[in-house]
Curated annotation (Swiss-Prot):
<dbReference type="InterPro" id="IPR009003">
    <property type="entry name" value="Peptidase_S1_PA"/>
</dbReference>
<protein>
    <recommendedName>
        <fullName>Thrombin-like enzyme elegaxobin-1</fullName>
        <ecNumber>3.4.21.-</ecNumber>
    </recommendedName>
</protein>
<keyword id="KW-0720">Serine protease</keyword>
<keyword id="KW-0645">Protease</keyword>
<feature type="disulfide bond">
    <location>
        <begin position="175"/>
        <end position="200"/>
    </location>
</feature>
<feature type="active site" description="Charge relay system">
    <location>
        <position position="85"/>
    </location>
</feature>
<dbReference type="InterPro" id="IPR043504">
    <property type="entry name" value="Peptidase_S1_PA_chymotrypsin"/>
</dbReference>
<feature type="disulfide bond">
    <location>
        <begin position="149"/>
        <end position="164"/>
    </location>
</feature>
<dbReference type="GO" id="GO:0006508">
    <property type="term" value="P:proteolysis"/>
</dbReference>
<feature type="active site" description="Charge relay system">
    <location>
        <position position="40"/>
    </location>
</feature>
<dbReference type="InterPro" id="IPR033116">
    <property type="entry name" value="TRYPSIN_SER"/>
</dbReference>
<dbReference type="GO" id="GO:0090729">
    <property type="term" value="F:toxin activity"/>
</dbReference>
<dbReference type="GO" id="GO:0044485">
    <property type="term" value="P:venom-mediated fibrinogenolysis in another organism"/>
</dbReference>
<dbReference type="InterPro" id="IPR001314">
    <property type="entry name" value="Peptidase_S1A"/>
</dbReference>
<comment type="similarity">
    <text>Belongs to the peptidase S1 family. Snake venom subfamily.</text>
</comment>
<feature type="active site" description="Charge relay system">
    <location>
        <position position="179"/>
    </location>
</feature>
<dbReference type="Pfam" id="PF00089">
    <property type="entry name" value="Trypsin"/>
</dbReference>
Length: 233
């Protein structure tokens, strides 16, 4: 996260740290057995850590899990920059709630443009040179109209299942290593960090986030055991 500050140790009990291959992502615990992240965070040898704040000085209640099952909209190959960058992971065993571990509920109402949103993650705090922090950083950004992202990235289709968020003057943004983490607007879990400008946090180059609300039926269906649940087109 660029332009943020160290998160409060008690404000992110739902934030998970995902390692795969040699990369890292964020993710969000949505109940004791399920984590929501980005499809592009899929890889071999995935490890999921819950209850982390400082990587160097771990909390006593850190728990480690591996995926038992992974679910994608159609397949792990169909996501694009503007569609289906979402992955639901069933953990190998449920986690115990503790001081630094608790789920974040799914949104009860759709996102509204203009809301103030919070982003968080262990991603780089500088760009284009990368500096990875020991603790997660948090920043406030705004939910922007999708047209702002279309203006910045001409390849985007007229409509998509993504949210556009950032600050138009630049300086605050998610960045490499934050992918898969949550976008929390007006207290509700509305987006999953997907992609953005390179370098990060440039003026008029907001970030793109998978729209969680649009995928609720699919998420709830999979968790309920309906493996035929379909993603919105």
């Amino acid at each position: 996260v660029i332009g943020g500050d160290e998160c409060n140790i008690n404000e992110h009990p739902f934030l998970v740290l995902v390692y795969y291959d040699d990369y890292q992502c964020g993710g969000t615990l949505i109940n004791e057995e399920w984590v929501l992240t980005a499809a592009h965070c899929n890889g071999k040898n995935m490890e999921i850590y819950l209850g982390v704040h400082s990587k160097k000085v771990p909390n006593k209640d850190v728990q480690r899990r591996v995926p038992k099952e992974k679910f994608f909209c159609d397949s792990s190959k169909t996501y694009t920059k503007w569609n289906k960058d979402i992955m639901l992971i069933r953990l190998d065993r449920p986690v115990r709630k503790s001081a630094h571990i608790a789920p974040l509920s799914l949104p009860s109402s759709p996102p509204s443009v203009g809301s103030v949103c919070r982003v968080m993650g262990w991603g780089t705090i500088t760009s284009p040179q990368e500096t990875y922090p020991d603790v997660p950083h948090c920043a406030k950004i705004n939910l922007l109209d999708y047209s702002e992202c279309r203006a910045a990235y001409p390849g985007l289709p007229p409509k998509s299942r993504t949210l556009c968020a950032g600050v138009l003057e630049g300086g605050k943004d998610t960045c490499g290593g934050d992918s898969g983490g949550p976008l929390i607007c007006n207290g509700q879990f509305q987006g999953i960090v997907s992609w953005g400008g390179d370098p990060c946090a440039q003026p008029h180059e907001p970030g793109s986030y998978t729209n969680v609300f649009d995928h609720l039926d699919w998420i709830k269906g999979i968790i309920a055991g309906n493996t035929d649940a379909t993603c919105p087109l």
